Design a protein with these regions (language model features):
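Active-site Tyr-X1-5-Lys
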Residues: 92-124, 131
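NAD(P)-dependent short-chain dehydrogenase/reductase
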Residues: 118-170
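Mid/C-terminal beta-alpha module of Rossmann-like enzyme folds, strongest
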Residues: 180-240, 256, 276-277
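Short-chain dehydrogenase/reductase
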Residues: 39-42, 81-82, 92-104, 137, ...
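Amphipathic terminal alpha-helices
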Residues: 258-261, 269-282
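Conserved Rossmann-fold NAD(P)-dependent oxidoreductase catalytic core, especially the SDR/UDP-sugar
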Residues: 46, 50-96
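NAD(P)H-binding glycine-rich loop region in Rossmannoid oxidoreductase-like domains
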Residues: 5-46, 54, 73-74
Length: 282
């Protein structure tokens, strides 16, 4: 396996990087930052399509790409345990979810137009935690992002207990190492192409996460949290980083049986480790 770095907007560079590749794993995606919508789209959408086309030109057998649980959207009729057959209906305001869902649709169209390959593998991870996970380190926008790591790592060691609002909503977490194992199985396993849900076993709540971090949860009823999140999500001129509040409006809990059966994948990290290593430290 070889890691290659480059600009996904540069088609020539992508073709050079994909030359003679048997499988291409593409993870580049802009999640936070101050870039314009046009710049973000040029990386997230056009850049990923460029990568797929370069892989096809190189004769790669497989193209593995990371989508997200957010592609399902956060809707009141979401069942607990959505399978990969559940429709992709992204959140109304969250650009990240909208672009992941659009990307799935466009990649499927590209793959259908090329019956000889590459075969398309789409992973839909839940909330990813770990020392290198972007979402765990960039909860605050722009120059404030480094504060997240410091606050999380020090809060549990303060002499005065810190209370944190903890909505009583079900959550799924997955450790970055388990996502890495799923990506590897997409590369080497015999499982068929398509979408795969990736999440740790079991369902927890925000209060569980808060306690594992050494903080004191201040319970918030699920109904109140959902109402507040829905109200905030509809506010005009909501900045991109604040759009994530829509994820708290309704749960999105996935079934991972297909990945376990078809890919031979299983999460190895317990919930306690997933919670305790969001920004480094084990």
């Amino acid at each position: 396996m070889e890691y290659r770095r480059g600009d996904v907007r540069d088609t020539k560079a992508l073709q050079d990087a994909s030359g003679h590749a048997d499988v291409v794993v593409h993870l580049a995606f802009m999640v936070t930052g101050a870039a314009s919508g046009e710049a973000i789209r040029s990386i997230n959408i056009e850049g990923t399509l460029n990568a797929f086309r370069a892989a096809a030109t190189a004769g790669a057998r497989r193209f593995v790409c990371s989508s997200s649980v957010a592609a399902y959207g956060f809707h009141p009729d979401n069942p607990i345990g959505m399978t990969e057959d559940w429709p992709v209906r992204p959140a109304a305001r969250l650009f990240y979810a909208q672009e992941k869902a659009e990307l799935e649709r466009l990649l499927r169209a590209e793959a259908a137009a090329r019956p000889t390959g590459p075969a398309l593998y789409l992973l839909r991870p839940s909330i990813v935690l770990g020392p290198h996970a972007m979402g765990a380190k960039a909860l605050l926008p722009g120059a404030l992002a480094p504060l997240t790591r410091s606050l999380v790592m020090r809060a549990g060691r303060l002499p005065v207990p810190v209370r944190v609002l903890a909505p009583a909503l079900p959550l799924q977490l997955v450790h970055e190492e388990d996502v890495g194992r799923a990506l590897l199985q997409c590369v080497i396993a015999a499982g068929p192409p398509g979408a795969y849900n990736i999440a740790g076993d079991g369902i927890i709540t925000a209060a569980d996460v808060v306690r594992e971090l050494g903080l004191l949860p201040l319970p918030v009823p699920a109904g109140a949290a959902q109402f507040a999140a829905s109200a905030i999500a509809t506010a005009p001129l909501l900045p991109p980083v604040a759009q994530w509040v829509e994820a708290a409006s309704h749960p999105a809990i996935m079934d991972t049986a297909r990945a376990k059966k078809e890919l031979g994948w299983a999460p190895a990290s317990p919930h306690s480790r997933r919670c305790r290593t969001p920004c480094g430290g084990d």
